[in-house]
Amino acid sequence: MTDDSEVPRIVSASREIAAAADEIFELIADPAQQPRWDGNDNLAEAPAGQRVRKVGEVFAMTTTKGHIRENHIVEFEEGRRIAWLPAEPASEPPGHLWRWELEPVDAARTRVTHTYDWSRLTDENRLPRARATTPAKLQASIDRLAAIAEG
């Protein structure tokens, strides 16, 4: 087993995007849009009509390996913050969290921060993938999101 004492269990990346926070948030809060900007190249598709609006909602996503994930919304502030815990269908989340935070710089620019927190991950089978989720992969998602939002 790998010693995780030197591996950060909370990683993040951030940058300014030349778009309004509300426009960027729509791309994040609508799961059907997520495969377009996923820097991990892990998301294949999500059914339309799952736009997230509050804590407690669950949206389904299919991975590129054909697995379905149910994502449980645990943080939500319209236009500013959204976070979810992925899980196998009809299972409790194993404890890793994806968070997006948007801070308007002005009406046309937004600081976007993307965080992956696996400090409470209990599923040992997921540890290798968690360790492989680096700030560079999170930055890739932000950069792809920026290309869409600024396009």
Residue ranges and their predicted role:
Residues 21-22, 74-79, 101-111:
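A short, structured loop/turn motif at beta-sheet edges
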Residues 16, 45-91, 111, 147-151:
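Glycine-rich portal/gate segments that line the openings of hydrophobic small-molecule binding cavities
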Residues 88-140:
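Beta-strand/loop substructures that line and gate deep hydrophobic ligand-binding cavities in soluble
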Residues 7-9, 65, 94, 108:
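Residue-level preference for beta-strand/loop junctions
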Residues 13-15, 69-75, 96-104:
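Hydrophobic/aromatic beta-strand elements that line small-molecule binding cavities or substrate pockets
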